[in-house]
């Protein structure tokens, strides 16, 4: 996904149409692309339980898999907020063509504080507050089944975001290059970045929606003030908070380390004798915790794990599996052989190793 700053400025501001601006609608207007009306991800799209609201995600192909995946994401009890490194989408008004497309900038180009596009850690409690992250940027000119036209897309690459941290993605008027002074921010967004009630510029915004938006954008307002960035120079922005998806995995690991090791069901026996290594196999009974039917190809087939009140995973079944070990035909180093673990998961064969 790549498009250059120069290309964007040429496409957005060639003078054949109105100056484009970010679509930022707090009125819940009935729109087939309403999912993108405040950008994504956004803390404006969190439910009361802290999970993302994906109810307006477009299902134009009526794909059962996509629809069920969106519902599962809302229902997943182990996650609030957004996953680190979630792609970012900002919708712009207007229609554009791709006639001037050129080579894009490298993601690291945007990881500086004077870039026209910036992904920023804005969390007051973060040790990395103010850090810029590299992003791979694209601009979609035409709509498809799931995305509207005139959609700016950014994918974080090369550096992971932290869990339980608030981030902002901003686009400044410098995206327009020589036409920077002609680019205007969305008025509702501009008021939020200045700490003003957006109802002053759009009376259709409810008091509740205005207050929520002011609270969501407060960390970005503080960051802009801290760094001396003029809110009038920010033409698009989204703010979101990451969750803690690793918490469940770490908890599982801690619980399982306390369990006794299951014994082998058979003795080790040699299965291969090659010039480079020998291979041995045995069988082992292991517990299974996912409900449903292997290999869980769709959410309807299960794959969830139930937990007891103390957070212990509930065993659903046991099965016997083959365990394979390969040993190099070289003298073992004083510190031992290096170990690589290969776990196939949801099916597969031991000799895939």
Task: Tell me what each language-model feature is.
Residues 268-336:
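N-terminal cap/lid segment of alpha/beta-hydrolase-fold proteins
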Residues 9-16:
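Hydrophobic h-region of N-terminal signal peptides that target proteins for export
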Residues 170, 177, 184, 326-353:
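Short, surface-exposed "cap/lid" segments of acyl-processing enzymes
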Residues 17-296:
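Acidic, low-complexity Ser/Thr/Gly/Pro-rich repeat segments typical of extracellular/periplasmic
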Residues 129, 209-216, 324-327, 342, ...:
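Unusually extended, aromatic-enriched hydrophobic runs near protein termini
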């Amino acid at each position: 996904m790549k498009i250059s700053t120069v290309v964007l400025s040429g496409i957005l501001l060639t003078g054949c149409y109105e100056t484009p601006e970010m679509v930022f609608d707090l009125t819940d207007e009935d729109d087939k692309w309403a999912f993108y009306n405040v950008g994504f991800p956004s803390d404006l799209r969190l439910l009361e339980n802290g999970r993302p609201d994906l109810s307006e995600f477009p299902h134009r192909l009526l794909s059962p898999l996509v629809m069920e995946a969106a519902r599962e994401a809302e229902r997943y009890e182990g996650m609030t907020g957004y996953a680190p490194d979630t792609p970012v989408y900002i919708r712009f008004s207007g229609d554009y063509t791709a006639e001037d497309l050129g080579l894009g900038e490298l993601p690291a180009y945007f990881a500086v504080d004077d870039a026209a596009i910036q992904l920023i850690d804005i969390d007051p409690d973060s040790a990395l507050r103010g850090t810029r992250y590299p992003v791979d940027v694209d601009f979609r000119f035409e709509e498809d089944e799931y995305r509207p036209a005139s959609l700016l897309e950014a994918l974080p690459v090369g550096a992971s975001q932290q869990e339980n941290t608030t981030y902002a993605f901003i686009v400044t008027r410098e995206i327009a290059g020589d036409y920077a002074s002609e680019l205007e921010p969305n008025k509702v967004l501009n008021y939020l970045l200045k700490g003003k009630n957006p109802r002053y510029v759009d009376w259709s915004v409810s008091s509740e929606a205005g207050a929520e938006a002011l609270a969501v954008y407060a960390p970005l307002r503080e960051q802009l003030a801290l760094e001396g960035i003029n809110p009038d120079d920010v033409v698009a922005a989204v703010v979101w908070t990451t969750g803690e998806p690793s918490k469940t995995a770490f908890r599982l690991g801690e619980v399982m380390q306390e369990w006794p090791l299951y014994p082998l069901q058979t003795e080790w026996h040699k299965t291969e004798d090659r010039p480079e290594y020998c291979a041995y196999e045995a069988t082992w009974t292991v517990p299974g915790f996912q409900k449903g039917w292997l290999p869980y190809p769709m959410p309807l087939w299960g794959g969830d794990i139930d937990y007891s009140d103390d957070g212990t995973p509930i065993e659903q079944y046991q099965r016997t599996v083959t365990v394979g070990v390969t040993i190099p035909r070289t003298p073992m180093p004083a510190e031992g052989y290096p170990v690589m673990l290969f776990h196939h998961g949801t099916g597969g064969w031991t000799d895939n190793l």
